[in-house]
Amino acid sequence: MMAELKNKEHYRKILCLLIPLGGVAFLLWYIKNSTCDVVYSDYIRLVNSYLPDVYDPRRFFVPDVLTRIPINYLERIINVELFGFSITFDRVLGAVSLGLAAWAFGVYFIRRRLGTVWFLLTMAVMFSLNKWEMITNGSGWSHFFAFACFYYHELVFDRVWAGEEKRGDTLQLILLPFLIILGTAGPYCAIYAVVMILSAAAGILRARIRKEGSSARRYLVFLFSSLIPLLLYILSNSFAVEEHAGATGRSLGALLADAPSFPVRFILKSLAGMVIGGEELIQWIEKGQMTDNICYLLGLFVAAGYLWALWLYLRHRLYERTLFPLMLLTGGALNHVLIFLSRYIFEKENYALSSRYALQFQVGILGIILTFALVSKAKEKVYPAGRAFMALFCIAILLGNGYTTYREIKKAPYREERFEQMEQLAPLMPFLSDEEMMEMEPAVPDLYEYRKGTDQIRNAFRILEENGLNVFRKPAS
């Protein structure tokens, strides 16, 4: 009997480590079948800002360097020197980074001995193509890597919280926030830092209740280890010059005076986009196949999932054993608020459905699933209606994300076709006039998704041509 249990545990561990590999392989297949290796969108700005001399210290030692994500400088040097500034290389890094995040959850599932079915559901969310825009735009690779780092840091903290500390964990909890916030997190550091600060504050409170003075002092060190790099990032960010094309310029107060329900509608749509991809929801609404009110109801359903998970977490005192699910729930909820505060200036509630935010929003969904898994494993008493809601929520998330991924796979050839069009026209870009660019169908700024000046597009491709990079790179003989 014991041997059988050990074998079962062994196979479960293997699955928790191998399934993320399958997820990475799936993303690589998707990248291969939906993209081409051509500069576009934000890469045009990056080429004009940092190429051809990726070693130029003047491009690094700038007041707002932390907002530019320092790890990108190292990656850019490697990319230019070894791969000729390949966008595909960045996309692969993004897929691998998402795999690292999945492995972090695999470690948690192994440690907590949670069921494989729950892990499969978690992986379905993790590798869902509701993040297609981030996956295909390789410049976001560092964001995937940042979230893998967030999860790892939270797991180390959770280990200490649960009394399962390993050698070196204290040092990691002091150093990790500096490395993550100052090195790779960029604008995503705000919610991560707040979650870690709140977690450390919870540790201080618990230590004082238990009258453990040394433990309280240690958590205080953890708190300042997150606060100090956050303040440094905020200082660096104060020197950044931000452009918001399309912003109305109205203050939040003016917006609320005219449309007091706008924040609620925006956040409900951002929640709804975690069941079914935002692009699908927008298309349904535009075609009249779904009303805005149905979308809001879908958002309320997800909000109910948050509240039910939080209630279960507190009701069954899961915080005595693990803090990780609560960290995820808090981070997910705060991300919805943060996106509203940063995007209300456009006064378009459908902005909440952009796939570029799915990476942030899915944090909360993962927290909900983990909470349900922990309650289910512990065989805690839950009313039948509550269990039915848990089942309904998980089925909805699985089917919704599955449908979104299916639809995105169907769209992959059309996305690839658009990239191929960019690739074919790229050699012409350095020589086209503004009029010629605008006369094309679609116009060059629309095709390359860069609308900050045709001169910027022309100059970026001229730099690439002169230095034999990206589409102008000569094949190795």
What are these regions (language model features)?
Residues 109-129, 147-148:
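Transmembrane-helix signature of polytopic, membrane-embedded enzymes
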Residues 3-76, 80-118, 164, 196-226, ...:
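Intrinsically disordered, polar/acidic, low-complexity terminal segments
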Residues 142-165, 197, 203, 364-367:
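Specific aromatic-rich, kink-prone transmembrane helix
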Residues 168-199:
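Membrane-interface alpha helices of multi-pass inner-membrane proteins
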Residues 37, 89-93, 131-142, 353-357:
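Membrane-embedded glycan-lipid processing machinery
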